Amino acid sequence: MSGFVPTHIFFTRGVGRGETQLVSFEAALRDAGIAPYNLSSISSIFPPHAEMITREEGLKKLSPGQILFTVLARNTSNELNRMVSAAIGYAIPRDRSKWGYLSEHHSFGETEKVAGSFAEKLAAEMLASTIGSSAQLAYDKQKEEYVLEDKILTTGSISSTAVVLESGEWTTVVAAAVLIVE
């Protein structure tokens, strides 16, 4: 049984500003390139054999109104000078017949690097715990990714951060993993 398994995945991010929370969210989705689609929230599994593609390649495979399965991180504020962050982390096993993990992280006061690193670590820890070796998970500073013996192929993240610039203005950030079923 093959089921309904996504074959491609891409990552995107956006920032939006507006007079209302909804308007700023729509602007963030537009900035991320995913506003013309119906977003359906899913949990944190990076499908076996799914190919990671660029945002540009992914958007070419889509049609307006299409239902998109996403792991979406979102944060918003209208507090002047407040920094909002959203990040998606991923961890992919070396054995691509196995599933990996996606994680979402939403925070205040964190830079893109800090938020992204946290989301990446979450995904790596979830993957390591399914392999049964979470105590041996280590960060390789040279490769800038988490490693677990020879079991993790790659880890990474995408993040978006913005500061509320005007009083009364809503600012929203999004980061998303978009999964495509063909």
Swiss-Prot record:
Superkingdom, natural source: Archaea
GO molecular function, one term: arginine decarboxylase activity
A single BP term in Gene Ontology: arginine catabolic process
Cofactor or coenzyme needed: pyruvate
Cofactor detail note: Binds 1 pyruvoyl group covalently per subunit.
EC number in record: 4.1.1.19
Catalytic activity as recorded in UniProt: L-arginine + H(+) = agmatine + CO2
Site features described as Cleavage (non-hydrolytic), chain residue numbers: 43-44
Modified residues (Pyruvic acid (Ser)): 44
InterPro entries to which the protein is assigned, alphabetical: Pyr-dep_his/arg-deCO2ase (IPR016104), Pyr-dep_his/arg-deCO2ase_sand (IPR016105), Pyruvoyl-dep_arg_deCO2ase (IPR002724)
Keywords: Decarboxylase, Lyase, Pyruvate
HAMAP family in the cross-refs: PvlArgDC
Record-stated family: Belongs to the PdaD family.
Protein name per UniProt: Pyruvoyl-dependent arginine decarboxylase
Biological source species: Thermoplasma acidophilum (strain ATCC 25905 / DSM 1728 / JCM 9062 / NBRC 15155 / AMRC-C165)
